[in-house]
């Protein structure tokens, strides 16, 4: 029984299927997942091979897994992560190991499209069936024999070439020696020259080297002599600089002492007393400023009152003139009588002469129009007055807001704080000067270092890094030379000629060393004369050895050689496009290092300068507060002026309001008069309703001519009366206001006289304040000068110490210079002696040349004899090697032929069994006679005309249907016939493999057949494969000998 669990596999999210060892039909429409069940079994057993479709993971999911359980075996294969787990009786195997066990138990995957595959694929599949596990071993044997034959051929060609080459070389060596013997005369041993002044037991070259060293040392001393002179000059400059600096410091000390003498009076006074005195003066100034502002306000009020008296006097004169210009009929005494008489006359007229009284209506109408005009004028005047009042009120509110926002006491406090801030500003300025002096001192040190840099090194700063890089390269060269010399002793015996290798910095020398060690790596002896090869991956030397008729591959690595090759490659990468690494003296290297140290010191000084500049920047930014003090004093003055303006605006507002009330009363009187006239009209005309102009006009047409003169008199009288009364009331109010103003003026003048000396008091206080403030500043300066004096004294001490040090250095340098002068004389003597040695060395070299010629002659003679004997031994070895290789080649050829013969026998026997099984199934599936045979044939693989032909076994299909031979691709068969032939091959392969564990899976194999034929086929399958799981997939339910039918829709 097989249990199949699917998770996110194709169209199945989470499904489990159970199959017994019986024939099962899986039926469902297209797209239901029938084939996915068979794919899942194949995926679990053999994975996603070439025949399986990819994309096993369900759409929208990240991974999938298939678990197949058979008896005590559980196989689980997952994708993302790709993992295979094989479990049997609590033993777990994974991935490749698990696949090996699956293939052993369930066999290899069957070929479903055997007929459609090429002849080469068919052959490969049949070979796997025929040989099973031993297929890989046979292929490995074939490959080994081929490789062995190839290597033997290559080696035989190499040895033949070497043999012919050595014979030619031997011949050429003998000919060369004979030609030389004809032309060269045998040289004689030369006489040894003698040097008279030579030191005992020391060679002339050693003596020369010793003298050269002495000369070099003396030259160095001369160089040191010049360096000491330059140092002495620099020290003299330093001394002059220090003297100047000491003089400057002394001058500064004198200046500060003079300043202290000038400010000596303030030594007893403390800063707190001065500050307290300034605060008291500020308080008194505050009180006096308040009084001063009050006086200014009173003065402005006095001026306003005086202006007002002038305006009142002008108005009074104008009113008096108007009063005099009125009609002479109106007199003060007879005023009331005149009016009563006029009114009594009118009353008698109203009673006795009604018609004559009605004529007055015209006058009243004109009066009404005039009243209406007056009303409109009064209205416009009231509107303009109201607007003016609103404007003035806004201005008053604005000025009041200004006065509210400005706090005079706070301003005075700010003024005192500003004085304190100005003191703080002076302290910070002093601190800033100290920091700037420090920066200047560090800059001096930095300039000294830059001078040293100019003296110690001639190159630029930009070139130092390049030179430093060159120094590093030189150190690498030295380390490489040390390593090369150390391994020479180890490799002397194995590799002769390693002693001659030298490296002085040239790239060509490195390439020579590389070539030597690479040749050594691949041509070293491995115990016997086995051929050498290179590994294609790691390039290690390999050898094929024959022991006891077995072929072994041997690897050999010399660690020293590999390590030096790595170091050579590293050094070659350092060269880039250069050919040599420039050699430098130790003194130059030391100069470069010293120069680099100086650069680092200069950078350290630059960092210190940056820190000090940041400290200067971080100091609180304060400014001189004198301008702010002046601006605050100006604001206090503007505040006082603002108060004066406010008083003016308030008086103006009062006047405007007064005029407005007058205008309102006037308009009320005019309105009352108009109402009176209207009432009279109602009574006179006799109309209860409102009087209209039409009624009046009709009335006027009758009585207009009679009442014209009387109307005029009445109008003049009444208007004059009103004007007169108004003028009288105005004169009265003006006189009252004048009395009030005179009293106010008297009080203001009295106040001003009492405080007449306030300006003098303020000036005195300001002078006293300025004096205290200057004393306070001077006190701060006094303290600064004290601290400055101490700093200058310390500087003077430091400069004196450095001056003493410089003088001691000068004395030591002078002593050294005296010693170096003696060395110059010694140098001249040694140079004369050196000339004598060089003349003798020339004679010595001539002797050495003649001796070398004699030695070379003897060496050549010995080498000739040795090379002839060597070539003869090499020729004998190569001939023996050729015989051995021929024997090995014949043995390999016989082995290859036997392997191919065994393969052919196994394949032909398998093909015969396949033909038998296939023919059995075809006889059951077809009514007509049909014969199908798999036949073996050998295809010739011949490349080129001269190449030897290679015969490769291949398989083809021969089909005789209805007595006719069909083509090899079976294209003449119908789809149903082709399906039956293909099914016969599938069943035959399954029966030959004889694996009852692996289920037989048939996917739509009878889709092109009718019901009866398909029933027949399935009954045949069931008979031939009893007690075995058979899975059949079909679109719809078909009849047949099925033990179980699964419909996926019902199952889902």
UniProtKB/Swiss-Prot annotation:
Q: Which InterPro entries match?
A: P-loop_NTPase, RecF/RecN/SMC_N
Q: List the disulfide bonds.
A: none
Tell me the Pfam families matching this sequence: SMC_N
Task: Report which superkingdom the organism of origin falls in.
Answer: Viruses
Concerning Gene3D superfamilies, the annotation shows: P-loop containing nucleotide triphosphate hydrolases (3.40.50.300)
| Cited PANTHER family | ABC TRANSPORTER ABCH.3
Question: According to its UniProt record, which protein family does this protein belong to?
Answer: Belongs to the IIV-6 050L family.
Q: What is this protein called?
A: Uncharacterized protein 050L
User: Could you tell me which species this protein originates from?
Assistant: Invertebrate iridescent virus 6 (IIV-6)
């Amino acid at each position: 029984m097989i249990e199949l669990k699917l998770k996110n596999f194709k169209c199945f999210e989470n499904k489990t299927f159970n199959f017994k060892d019986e024939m099962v039909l899986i039926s469902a429409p297209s797209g239901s997942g029938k084939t996915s069940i068979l794919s899942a079994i194949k995926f679990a057993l053999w994975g996603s091979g070439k025949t399986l479709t990819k994309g096993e993971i369900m759409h929208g999911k990240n991974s999938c897994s298939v678990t197949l359980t058979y008896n005590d075996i559980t196989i689980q294969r997952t994708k993302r992560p790709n993992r295979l787990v094989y479990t049997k009786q609590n033993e777990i195997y994974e991935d490749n190991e698990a696949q090996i066990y699956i293939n052993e138990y369930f066999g290899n995957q069957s070929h479903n499209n055997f007929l459609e595959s090429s002849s080469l694929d068919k052959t490969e599949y049949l070979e796997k069936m025929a040989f099973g596990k031993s297929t890989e071993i046979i292929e490995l044997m074939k490959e080994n024999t081929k490789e062995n034959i190839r290597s033997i051929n290559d080696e035989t060609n190499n040895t033949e070439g070497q043999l012919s080459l050595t014979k030619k070389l031997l011949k050429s060596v003998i000919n060369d020696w004979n030609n030389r013997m004809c032309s060269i005369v045998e040289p004689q041993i030369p006489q040894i020259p003698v040097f008279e002044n030579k030191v005992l037991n020391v060679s002339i070259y050693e003596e020369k080297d010793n003298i050269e060293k002495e000369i070099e040392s003396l030259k160095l001393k001369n160089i040191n002599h010049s360096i000491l002179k330059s140092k002495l000059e620099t020290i003299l400059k330093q001394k002059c600089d220090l003297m100047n600096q000491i003089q400057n410091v002394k001058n500064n000390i004198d200046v500060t002492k003079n300043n202290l003498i000038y400010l000596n009076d303030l030594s007893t006074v403390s800063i707190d007393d001065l500050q307290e005195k300034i605060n008291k003066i500020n308080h008194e100034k505050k009180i006096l400023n308040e009084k001063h502002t009050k006086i200014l306000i009173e003065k402005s009020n006095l001026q306003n009152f005086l202006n007002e008296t002038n305006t009142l006097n002008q108005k009074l004169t104008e009113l008096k003139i108007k009063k005099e210009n009125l009609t002479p009929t109106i007199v003060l005494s007879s005023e009331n009588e005149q009016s009563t008489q006029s009114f009594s006359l009118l009353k008698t007229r109203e009673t006795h002469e009604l018609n004559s009284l009605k004529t007055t209506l015209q006058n009243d109408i004109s009066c009404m129009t005039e009243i209406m005009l007056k009303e409109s004028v009064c209205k416009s005047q009231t509107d303009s007055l109201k607007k003016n009042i609103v404007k003035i009120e806004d201005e008053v509110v604005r000025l009041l807001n200004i006065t509210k926002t400005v706090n005079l006491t706070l301003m005075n406090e700010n003024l005192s704080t500003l004085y304190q801030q100005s003191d703080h500003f002076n302290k910070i300025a002093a601190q800033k000067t100290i920091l700037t002096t420090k920066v200047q001192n560090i800059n001096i040190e930095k300039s000294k270092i830059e001078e040293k840099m100019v003296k110690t090194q001639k190159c630029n700063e930009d070139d130092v890094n390049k030179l430093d890089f060159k120094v590093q390269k030189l150190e690498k060269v030295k380390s490489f030379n040390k390593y090369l010399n150390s391994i020479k002793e180890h490799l002397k015996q194995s590799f002769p000629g390693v002693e001659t290798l030298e490296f002085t910095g040239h790239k060509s020398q490195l390439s020579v060393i590389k070539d030597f060690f690479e040749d050594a790596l691949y041509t070293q002896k491995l115990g016997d004369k086995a051929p050498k090869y290179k590994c294609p991956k790691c390039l290690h030397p390999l050898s094929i050895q024959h022991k006891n008729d077995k072929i072994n591959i041997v690897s050999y690595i010399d660690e020293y050689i590999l390590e030096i090759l790595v170091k050579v490659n590293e050094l070659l990468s350092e060269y880039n496009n250069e050919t040599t690494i420039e050699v430098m003296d130790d003194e130059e290297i030391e100069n470069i290092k010293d120069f680099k140290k100086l650069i680092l010191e200069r950078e350290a000084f630059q960092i210190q300068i940056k820190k000090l500049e940041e400290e200067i920047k971080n100091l609180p930014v304060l400014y001189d507060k004198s301008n702010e003090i002046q601006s605050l004093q100006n604001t206090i003055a503007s505040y006082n002026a603002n108060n004066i303006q406010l008083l003016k605006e308030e008086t103006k507002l009062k006047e405007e309001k007064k005029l407005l009330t007058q205008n309102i009363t006037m308009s009320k009187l005019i309105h009352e008069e108009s109402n009176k006239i209207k009432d009279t009209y109602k009574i006179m005309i006799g109309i209860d309703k409102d009087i209209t102009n039409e009624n009046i006009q009709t009335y006027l047409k009758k009585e207009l001519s009679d009442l014209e003169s009387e109307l005029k008199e009445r109008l003049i009288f009444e208007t004059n009366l009103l004007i007169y009364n108004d003028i009288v009331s105005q004169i009265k109010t003006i006189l009252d206001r004048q009395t009030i103003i005179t009293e106010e003026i008297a009080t203001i003048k009295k106040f001003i006289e009492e405080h007449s000396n306030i300006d003098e008091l303020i000036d005195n206080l300001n002078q006293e304040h300025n004096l205290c403030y200057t004393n306070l500043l001077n006190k701060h300066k006094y303290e600064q000068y004290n601290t400055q004096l101490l700093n200058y004294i310390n500087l003077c001490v430091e400069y004196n110490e450095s001056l003493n040090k410089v003088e001691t250095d000068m004395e030591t340098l002078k002593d050294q210079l005296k010693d170096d002068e003696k060395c110059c004389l010694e140098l001249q003597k040694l140079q004369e002696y050196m000339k004598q040695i060089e003349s003798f060395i020339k004679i010595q070299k001539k002797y050495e040349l003649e001796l070398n010629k004699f030695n070379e002659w003897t060496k050549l003679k010995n080498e000739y004899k040795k090379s002839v004997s060597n070539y003869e031994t090499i020729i004998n070895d190569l001939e023996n090697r050729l015989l051995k290789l021929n024997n090995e080649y014949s043995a390999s050829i016989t082995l290859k032929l036997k392997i191919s013969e065994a393969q052919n026998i196994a394949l032909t026997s398998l093909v015969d069994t396949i033909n038998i099984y296939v023919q059995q199934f075809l006889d059951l599936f077809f009514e007509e006679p049909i014969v199908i045979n798999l036949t073996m044939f050998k295809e010739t693989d011949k490349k080129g005309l001269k190449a030897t032909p290679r015969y490769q076994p291949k398989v083809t299909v021969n089909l005789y249907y209805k007595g006719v031979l069909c083509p090899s691709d079976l294209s003449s068969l119908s789809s149903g016939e082709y399906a039956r032939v293909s099914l016969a091959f599938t069943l035959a392969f399954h029966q030959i493999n004889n694996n009852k564990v692996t289920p037989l899976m048939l996917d739509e194999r009878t889709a092109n057949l009718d019901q009866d034929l398909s029933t027949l086929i399935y009954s045949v399958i069931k008979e031939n494969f009893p007690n075995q799981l058979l899975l059949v997939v079909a679109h719809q339910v078909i009849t047949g000998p099925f033990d179980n039918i699964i419909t996926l829709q019902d199952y889902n």
